[in-house]
Amino acid sequence: SKWMPNSEDVMGWNVKNSGLHVVFSKSIPVIISKWLGPFIHEFLNRYDLHPAQIENFVAHPGGKKVLQAYEEALQLTTEHTTISRDILKAHGNMSSPTVLYVLEQFMLKRNEPNTYGLLVALGPGFSGEAVLLEWRE
């Protein structure tokens, strides 16, 4: 888990009498491109891993530009983000639960044993969450 200081205006919710109103800054893809790489490298270093060892990238698909920013920041191919793109196309950005729809599709497909996956979601405040996954026999 990592939070970016002074980023309350990047992503979140405004609570008004008329209900919840989402806050999405247009700078999110640029922030991801610069901020996500160091965060994920630091996270993977704790496990003596590097991004090239990640077979399955389970990403919350905030939007097409967000997925492109993931690819740029972590040197991923579009193959890594295909399932996230498919979920985005079928359901849109459903907020927090969206990454669980992506995870479900990874769990349903045949994965090679003894491979690693990385679940990544971004959220309000601007924050990032990462979970290391391992597929076993």
Please identify what each model-predicted range represents.
Residues 1-34, 38-42, 122, 134-137:
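Condensing-enzyme catalytic core mediating Claisen C-C bond formation in acyl metabolism
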Residues 17, 42-46, 53, 73-75:
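Membrane-interfacial loop- and helix-cap regions that link adjacent transmembrane helices
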Residues 25-26, 47, 63:
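Short, structured coil/loop segments at alpha-helix boundaries
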Residues 33, 37, 51, 55-137:
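Claisen-condensing/thiolase-fold acyl-transfer catalytic domains that form or cleave C-C bonds
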